């Protein structure tokens, strides 16, 4: 029978990542793409990792937790601890760093409440975490009348993620015909978004007085993220050099070489290490275009550094207001990067400031002014929640309330299934082959949805063509 004991579990701690280093290393080693995608289907390891994207596949995280709870009857505090992980996921950006941290938190939860269960749980990887917490958000309460609408959007997102790995959309796919049937499209472009009935709005707790900022750097793990991508094409040469320097002084995660299977048992192609462990990232692949990559390093900073969100907000303000003339945004960014005094407001000068200075101006331009996923991540990220501190007694009561599910909403950002679906489709289109009609229709819908939600960005038409 379940008991009700007090739990001291707190998500988003770097100590949790380090504690589960061995398991996380194994997950990272299996997150590399084959060098020849055409031969990927011959690899049982690749097929096992990506099986979650099958249109009829169940959620591995849901299945794992359901089986554990059914067979082991955990303490009641388990449900509060799982709910607080979900709450943190709502306030985190959709990045590789977030996927890694959430996986570590889930491993910790299983170890705490199910000590007799197999550890680690078999066949759980970063893609499963991404689908559960960020794509499908399985933990959210849904308006029953809208469950089919919500499910259709999830199926569409899965289809585009699958296309990201295969390289192309199905020839039978027609967005112009399908999209109006999935959403209650407004008649006029200026109408408000119609997405809010999909989830139950207005039932969250005001956690504004609960979380308090912690000391800068207490649970930052940006150094680990840089190390994971040090030998890849994701970063500029200067940031790669910084990552290499960090790696030489770090005793953790030194065994990240991808696992090569026995050719006689699994005739898999050689793995592409230049793309890094990209199956842990939302992009599921690594592409470069005009000095940017499909892995946004600044978004990774949001998830892994407590100061990043405020720094980028201040930097954006400086870009927009430091010059009165009509100087291009890229030039403004360059001027600030080259002026040491202009970045003196950054407290973490050794790491965060170095990363920002080492980024290409195009990376910063894309993140601050162009990319819809970067804009969404900036709105979702709440550093006070992710890196803040909460009194133990209040935190225990807060977790118990969250366990009912009614309060699992963002503190300040209005959830929008339609917007998040369109952004995922847009990002997938940047890496897959699709007909021009599909591309233009999706870009039009993304631009319209961004305007409805008060995002001020350059047209997605330009972002689609110049960046990745």
Curated annotation (Swiss-Prot):
Name used for this protein in its record = Packaging protein UL32 homolog
Q: Which GO terms describe its molecular function?
A: zinc ion binding
Function as written in the Swiss-Prot or TrEMBL entry: Plays a role in efficient localization of neo-synthesized capsids to nuclear replication compartments, thereby controlling cleavage and packaging of virus genomic DNA.
Q: From which source organism is this entry?
A: Alcelaphine herpesvirus 1 (strain C500) (AlHV-1)
Task: Tell me its family.
Answer: Belongs to the herpesviridae UL32 protein family.
Q: Where can this protein be found?
A: Host cytoplasm; Host nucleus
Q: Which UniProt keywords apply?
A: Host cytoplasm, Host nucleus, Metal-binding, Zinc, Zinc-finger
- What are the boundaries of the region Zinc finger 1? 59-138
Stretches the record annotates as Zinc finger 2? 296-374
Q: Cite a GO CC annotation.
A: host cell nucleus
Which of this chain's residues are annotated to bind Zn(2+) 1? 59, 62, 132, 138
InterPro entries, alphabetized: Herpes_env
> Where does the chain bind Zn(2+) 2?
296, 299, 367, 374
The gene from which this protein is expressed is: 68
């Amino acid at each position: 029978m379940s008991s009700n004991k007090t739990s001291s579990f707190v998500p988003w701690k770097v100590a949790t990542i380090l504690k589960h280093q061995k398991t996380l290393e194994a997950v990272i080693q299996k997150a590399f793409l084959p060098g020849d995608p055409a031969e990927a289907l011959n690899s049982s390891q690749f097929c096992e990792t990506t099986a979650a994207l099958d249109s009829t596949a169940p959620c591995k995280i849901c299945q794992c937790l359901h089986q554990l709870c059914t067979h082991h009857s955990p303490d009641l505090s388990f449900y509060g601890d799982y709910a607080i992980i979900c709450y943190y996921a709502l306030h985190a950006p959709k990045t590789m760093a977030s996927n890694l941290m959430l996986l570590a938190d889930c491993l910790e939860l299983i170890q705490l409440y199910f000590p007799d269960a197999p550890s680690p749980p078999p066949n759980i990887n970063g893609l499963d975490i991404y689908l559960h917490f960020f794509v499908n958000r399985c933990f959210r309460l849904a308006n029953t009348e809208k469950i089919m609408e919500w499910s259709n959007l999830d199926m569409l997102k899965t289809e585009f993620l699958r296309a990201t790995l295969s390289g192309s959309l199905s020839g039978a796919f027609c967005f112009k015909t399908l999209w109006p049937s999935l959403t209650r499209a407004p008649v006029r472009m200026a109408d408000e978004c119609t997405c809010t009935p999909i989830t139950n709005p207005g039932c969250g707790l005001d956690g504004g007085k609960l979380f308090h900022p912690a000391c800068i750097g207490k649970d930052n793990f940006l150094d680990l993220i840089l190390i994971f991508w040090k030998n890849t094409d994701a970063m500029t040469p200067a940031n790669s050099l910084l990552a290499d320097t960090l790696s030489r002084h770090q005793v953790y995660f030194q065994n990240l070489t991808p696992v090569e299977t026995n050719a006689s048992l699994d005739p898999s192609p050689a793995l592409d290490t230049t793309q890094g462990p990209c199956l842990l990232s939302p992009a599921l692949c690594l592409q470069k275009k005009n000095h940017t990559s499909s892995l946004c390093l600044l978004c990774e900073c949001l998830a892994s550094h407590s100061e990043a969100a405020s720094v980028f907000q201040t930097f954006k303000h400086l870009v927009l207001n430091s010059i009165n003339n009509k100087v291009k945004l890229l030039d403004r960014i360059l001027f600030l990067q080259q002026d040491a005094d202009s970045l003196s407001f950054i407290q973490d000068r050794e790491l965060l400031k170095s990363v920002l200075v080492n980024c290409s101006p195009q990376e910063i331009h894309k993140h601050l002014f162009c990319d819809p996923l970067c804009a969404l991540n900036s709105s979702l990220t709440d550093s006070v929640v992710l890196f803040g501190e909460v009194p133990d007694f209040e935190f225990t009561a807060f977790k118990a309330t969250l366990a009912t599910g009614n309060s699992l909403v963002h503190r300040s950002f209005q959830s929008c299934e339609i917007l998040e679906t369109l952004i995922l489709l847009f990002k997938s289109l940047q890496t897959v082959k699709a007909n021009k009609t599909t591309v233009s229709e999706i870009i039009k819908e993304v631009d319209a949805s961004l305007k409805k939600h008060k995002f001020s960005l350059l047209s997605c038409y330009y972002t689609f063509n110049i960046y990745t």
